[in-house]
Swiss-Prot record:
The gene is trmB. Pfam families: Methyltransf_4 (PF02390). PANTHER family: 3-DEOXY-D-MANNO-OCTULOSONIC-ACID TRANSFERASE/TRNA GUANINE-N 7 - -METHYLTRANSFERASE, PENTACOTRIPEPTIDE-REPEAT REGION OF PRORP DOMAIN-CONTAINING PROTEIN. The lineage of its organism: Bacteria, Bacillati, Bacillota, Bacilli, Bacillales. This is tRNA (guanine-N(7)-)-methyltransferase. It catalyses: guanosine(46) in tRNA + S-adenosyl-L-methionine = N(7)-methylguanosine(46) in tRNA + S-adenosyl-L-homocysteine. Its EC number is 2.1.1.33. It comes from Staphylococcus saprophyticus subsp. saprophyticus (strain ATCC 15305 / DSM 20229 / NCIMB 8711 / NCTC 7292 / S-41). It comes from the Bacteria. GO terms for molecular function: tRNA (guanine(46)-N7)-methyltransferase activity.
Length: 211
């Protein structure tokens, strides 16, 4: 369900410049923004932020970036960060296509893609976050041993992503064809994931690296 547009969202986000980058002011100096040398994990398309804020709370030794282009959605993430007093998470309000403007080559240790828009129509293939254009960006910002963790309830997108990544020269270290049936204790659910798994939807997951 698409969140209703909130005309006041931009002003709300601008009140927390130490947490939120809405204008590219921290582009190219993300590590300096955190002011430490901890590993950086990114979630592209964070939605309401349940996944990444839960992860950040569990792992204070890691720096997290929530990248979400919709300002009306990002305010939900910001509220969670403030309410939980998290200091190891920053928010970037921009599109994934701008990744290499924000991150230096090899600066990121892990990238999460959770329940991305499947863009099912063939003419929209290039918009999928596992299309080769995006994979090239991920390869650039990830460390040599960096990982992509991907989850979806869309079988078509999962199959496409496996093929797209394979053709790009990636390999898979883990593939789950029914995540919740396997009872993975390390799994952290997104809001979307909980909603659809409760309805019996199968959740697909994989972890991948570049050769």
């Amino acid at each position: 369900m698409r969140m209703r547009y909130k005309p006041w969202a931009e002003d709300y986000l601008k009140k927390e410049p130490n947490i939120v980058d809405i204008d590219g002011s921290h582009a190219g100096r993300i590590s300096e923004w955190f002011d430490n040398d901890q590993p950086i994990y990114i979630e592209v398309g964070s939605g309401r932020g349940q996944f990444i804020t839960t992860l950040a709370a569990k792992h204070p030794e890691i720096n997290f970036i929530s990248m979400e282009r919709e300002k009306s959605v990002m305010i939900k993430v910001l509220d969670k960060v403030i309410e939980q007093g998290l200091t190891n998470i920053k928010l970037i309000c921009n599109d994934a296509i701008e990744l290499n403007d924000y991150f230096k080559d090899g600066e990121v240790s892990r990238l999460y893609l959770n329940f991305s828009d499947p863009w099912p129509k063939k003419r929209h293939t290039k918009r999928r976050l596992t299309y080769q254009t995006y994979l090239a960006l991920y390869k650039q910002v990830l460390k040599d041993d960096g990982e992509i963790h991907f989850k979806t309830d869309n079988r078509g997108l999962f199959a496409y992503s496996l093929e797209s990544m394979s053709q790009f020269g990636m390999y898979f270290t883990k593939i789950n064809l029914n995540l919740h049936e396997e009872d993975d204790e390390e799994n952290i659910e997104t809001e979307y994931e909980r909603k659809f798994s409760d309805k019996g939807s199968r959740i697909y997951r994989m972890e991948a690296k570049f050769h």
